[in-house]
Regions:
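Helix-to-loop junction immediately C-terminal to a conserved catalytic motif
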Residues: 52
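Conserved ABC ATPase "signature" region
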Residues: 118-136
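Conserved catalytic motifs of ABC-family nucleotide-binding domains
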Residues: 161
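Conserved structural motif at the start of ABC-family nucleotide-binding domains
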Residues: 6, 20-23
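Conserved ABC transporter NBD signature motif
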Residues: 60-70, 77
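Catalytic Walker B motif of ABC-type/P-loop ATPase nucleotide-binding domains
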Residues: 165-169
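Conserved ABC ATPase signature
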Residues: 115, 140-144
């Protein structure tokens, strides 16, 4: 039997007597792509940090890729988990080239701390090529557009061939055209036979495309609901999630949200 990619059991997280996550149980099977949906401040970022070993739960059990956190080498695990966040852009050395940023993903590091081989640079260039971003390989990060930077960060996450890819609100800062191009690229990636299991974190239902098979709603640090998109993305659930009357519409395969207040 294949082990789940993610298995959280009764995870709680407290900081300075404040409970941020409560009784989170979540199981993700290989190849099952999920969206994690919730309002700002609901605990999404903390949950991601727990999944990647940057925070430790106060209570509960975390298993990722069959390994129980606390009983495995977290450094090695991070090389198997790709994490893309717009916040990462601020931590990148401004003068690093795009291909340097991608290559740093081989070590799960921010910046380069060793000499990379020609083969490693070629592998990095190949991932950029697959994402249609080969032309920016030698450009400094500081000169890249937001859309180009997102492709570079995706390439950085993919270069080590991760088994789990976490995208933390990747469309923040993108104009409508750039966002649609990005979502199209992501859909193509998800449909590849060797694609990693993907978790897309967002608070916009418009970004939940048909390749996403499951949705988890997080509210006030607790699981509000989880299941297939058609069952979860409803007027009732969205109104409860955002504490505001909402209507949900379909335009073809796309979800649309209207605030009714």
């Amino acid at each position: 039997m294949t082990e789940p990619v993610v298995e959280l059991e009764d995870v709680c997280f407290c900081r300075k007597e404040r409970q941020i996550l409560s009784d989170i149980s979540w199981r993700i099977e290989p190849g099952a792509h999920w969206a994690l949906l919730g309002a700002n401040g609901c605990g999404k970022t903390t949950l991601l940090k727990i999944l990647t070993g940057y925070e430790w739960p106060t209570f509960g059990t975390v298993r990722v890729l069959g390994k129980r956190f606390g009983r495995c080498d977290i450094g090695k695990m991070r090389k198997l988990i790709g994490w893309v966040s717009s916040a990462m852009t601020q931590r990148l050395p401004a003068q690093d080239s795009a291909i340097d940023v991608v290559a740093s993903g081989l070590d799960a590091s921010i910046g380069l701390y060793r000499h990379f081989t020609d083969e490693e640079y070629e592998a990095s260039l190949n991932v950029l090529r697959q994402l249609g971003a080969e032309s920016v390989a030698q450009q400094h990060c500081i000169t890249l557009s937001q859309g180009e930077m997102q492709k570079v960060l995706i390439a950085r996450a993919l270069v080590s061939r991760p088994q789990l890819l976490i995208l933390d609100e990747p469309c923040i800062g993108l104009d409508p055209a750039s966002r649609q191009h990005f979502l199209n690229d992501l859909a193509r990636l998800a449909k590849k036979g060797d694609a990693p299991t993907i978790i897309l974190v967002t608070h916009h239902i418009e970004e939940i495309d048909p390749w996403i098979q499951h949705v988890l709603l997080l509210k006030d640090g607790k699981v509000l609901a989880s299941g297939c998109p058609d069952d979860i993305i409803t007027c009732r659930q969205m109104s409860a999630l955002f504490d505001y009357p909402c209507s949900v519409f379909r335009q073809g395969a796309d979800f649309l949200l209207r605030m009714d207040g």
